[in-house]
From Swiss-Prot:
A biological process term (GO) from this entry: DNA-templated transcription initiation
Protein name, per record: TATA-box-binding protein D
InterPro entries for the chain: TBP, TBP_archaea, TBP_dom_sf
CDD domains in alphabetical order: TBP_archaea
Length: 186
């Protein structure tokens, strides 16, 4: 039997690391196959991987941000591959630079249509933003876990801001409980 939290799917994981080394981006873009660097458009090198599918943004300070991975394991694998590719170029990077998950974006569903006007009133205006003329979703901010949930009339939702996948599951359980208590779910 499937549960509500089974509808949650990770769409994107963003993580950062510090390579502990300042980098010459012009040279890096030349030496690193497939790297893109256009300082007029973006101040870092963009290095894409096909497996795991991701893009790592590498800055001259040695900071790097990996985005596009679809699991926490994938983001760790992607950063490890990038670090190895940089080491292969002779760049001295300490062993196992720490990886910090900054944001996990998940999608999910409450499996029913929602009355967003009633939800906005029921949840209270202090934690809710709902302006359907500007955006079709209701923005609901939770404190624990510290995430933002976008609710749509279709019952679909997006949960962002978590640092581990359990945050999304917990958020969905809280939302389901609150909406049920308000009599807004069937």
């Amino acid at each position: 039997m499937s549960t509500l939290t089974d509808t949650i799917q990770i769409e994107n994981v963003v993580a950062s690391t510090d390579l502990s080394q300042e980098l010459a981006l012009e040279q890096l873009a030349t030496d690193l196959p497939g790297a893109e660097y256009n300082p007029g458009d973006f101040p870092g090198v963009i290095y894409r991987l096909d497996d795991p599918k991701s893009a790592t943004l590498i800055f001259d300070s040695g900071k790097a941000v990996c985005t596009g991975a679809q699991s926490v394991d994938d983001v760790h694998d992607a950063i490890s591959i990038v670090v190895e590719d940089l080491r292969d170029l002779g760049i001295d990077i300490p062993p196992s630079p720490p990886v910090h998950v900054q944001n996990i974006v998940c999608s999910g569903s409450l499996d029913q249509d929602l009355n967003l006007n009633a939800i906005a009133i029921g949840l209270g205006l202090e934690d809710v933003e709902y302006e359907p003329e500007q955006f079709p979703g209701l923005v609901y901010r939770l404190n624990d876990p510290d995430v933002v949930v976008l609710l749509f009339g279709s019952g679909k939702l997006v949960i962002t801001g978590g640092s581990n996948p359990d945050d999304a599951h917990h958020a969905l359980e809280i939302i389901h409980e609150r909406l049920t208590d308000l009599g807004l779910l069937e």
